[in-house]
Swiss-Prot record:
Low complexity compositional bias, start-end: 71-122
InterPro entries named in the record: DUF4074, HD, HD_metazoa, Homeobox_Antennapedia_CS, Homeobox_CS, Homeodomain-like_sf
Compartments in which it is found: Nucleus
Location, primary (coarse class): nucleus
PROSITE patterns attached to this UniProt entry: ANTENNAPEDIA, HOMEOBOX_1, HOMEOBOX_2
Pfam families in the cross-refs: DUF4074, Homeodomain
Chain spans, region Disordered: 1-122, 134-173, 227-256, 372-404
Known function: Sequence-specific transcription factor which is part of a developmental regulatory system that provides cells with specific positional identities on the anterior-posterior axis.
Protein name: Homeobox protein Hox-D3
Length: 404
């Protein structure tokens, strides 16, 4: 068995001869052992690790075989551990030069059990304390640290609130008392944004933290904005609002504005008669009927040779006549209208004008000199109106018409 064990390991001892079991003669006593044989021939053995560095001059055959037997038996049990140790220890041992016999004998006498026992703690030392921590525990610790830091330094302000320790800790909702809410609402009524000195003062007054007051004001401002938006949508007009209608320029003036200016390009500044009992209602309703005048463009008629466009106001009754097609006509350059409930015709030409240039008609100069209104035959002629005005005794000379 000793021979078989030695012959199995004879590849490691290539330079030695083995003549007889009872003789102790070896070939060359000292021979440099190449390191390539360690790596290529047999890497898993512990014997070349201990014998390659120093070659002893003479050893007993029984000691040598006994060491190899014990190491080969331990190698079968701890093959993986010995391989890892040999790979770790081979470079420094192979690079070292031959030393004294005492160090070699100490290496020889160390049993394989000590080598195997040293291999186990070497592997156990690789497990560090940080490897024992699981990811879940580290996440919980990090979340607790972040929550604490966030509660301490939120918005650049320091507060004494800290999240309670625990894996699933949640911030407790602050319950404000009625007295605190009243004071906060009062402060919000005067100032929607608090400065820091005032916030510190209120925190001391209400026994709250600055952070709580700051968050309450943020939430209250958002609520205020939502309320304003809801109110704005509720009160938004669907049609023309009263303030959008053109206002009257004065109690004695009528202005065609807005849509009529875009269509007709006319501006009338005719003063209303002071003899009206209800001047606001008898000003022909021009301010109130601005939108209907713009909407009844298909009913309009056109004077030949002029840009004046009149509208048949059948719905409002301001310009209605017996033939339902009446419209304002020109009487010597004056603006004449027929009232729905009154028989006499009101001629605005008899009223005193501030100046003859205050009444501007852009289309009057284009009307022919005979004052004949082409398609407007149903209306009374110029002579009829002048005779009707003569019966009233309020005839005045018509102002001279000029271009704008």
């Amino acid at each position: 068995m000793q021979k078989a064990t030695y012959y199995d390991n004879s590849g490691l001892f290539g330079g030695y001869t083995y003549p007889k079991p009872d003789s102790y003669n070896y070939g060359p006593a000292h021979q440099s052992y190449p390191t390539s044989n360690i790596d290529s021939d047999y890497q898993g053995s512990v014997c070349p690790i201990q014998t390659a560095a120093v070659r002893p001059p003479a050893l007993k055959d029984s000691d040598l075989n006994g060491d190899c037997m014990r190491q080969s038996s331990s190698q079968n049990n701890n093959n993986n551990q010995a391989t890892s140790i040999s790979e770790q220890q081979a470079p420094p041992l192979s690079a070292s030069s031959p030393s004294s016999n005492s160090s070699a004998s100490q290496k020889k006498k160390s049993p394989s059990s000590s080598a195997s026992s040293s291999a186990t703690p070497a592997l156990t030392k690789q497990i560090f304390p940080w490897m024992k921590e699981t990811r879940q525990n580290s996440k919980q610790k990090n979340s607790n640290n972040c929550a604490t830091a966030g509660s301490d330094h939120d918005g650049g302000e320091v507060s004494d609130e800290k999240s309670p320790p625990g894996p699933a800790s949640k911030r407790v909702k602050t319950a404000y008392t009625s007295a605190q809410l009243v004071e906060l609402e009062k402060e919000f009524h005067f100032n929607r944004y608090l400065c820091r000195p005032r916030r510190v003062e209120m925190a001391n007054l209400l026994n709250l933290t600055e952070r709580q007051i700051k968050i309450w004001f943020q939430n209250r401002r958002m609520k205020y904005k939502k309320d304003q938006k809801s109110k704005g949508l509720a009160h938004s007009p669907l049609g023309h609002s009263p303030d959008r209608s053109p206002p009257l320029s004065g109690p004695n003036h009528i202005g065609y504005s807005g849509q009529l200016q875009n269509v007709n390009s006319l501006s009338y500044d005719a003063p209303s008669p002071p003899s009206f009992a209800k001047p606001q209602q008898n000003m022909y309703g021009l301010a109130a009927y601005t939108a209907p005048l713009g909407g009844c463009i298909p009913q309009q008629k056109r004077y030949p040779g002029s840009e004046y466009e009149h509208h048949g106001m059948q719905s409002n009754g301001s310009f209605a006549n017996a033939n339902l097609q009446s419209s304002p006509v020109y009487v010597g350059g004056n603006f004449v209208d027929s009232m729905p409930a009154s028989g006499p015709m009101f001629n605005l030409g008899h009223l005193p004008h501030p100046s003859s240039t205050s009444v501007d008609y852009s289309c009057a100069a284009q009307i022919p000199g005979n004052h004949h209104h082409g398609p407007c035959d149903p209306h009374p002629t110029y002579t009829d109106l002048t005779s009707h005005q003569a019966s009233q005794g309020r005839i005045q000379e018509a102002p001279k018409l000029t271009h704008l």
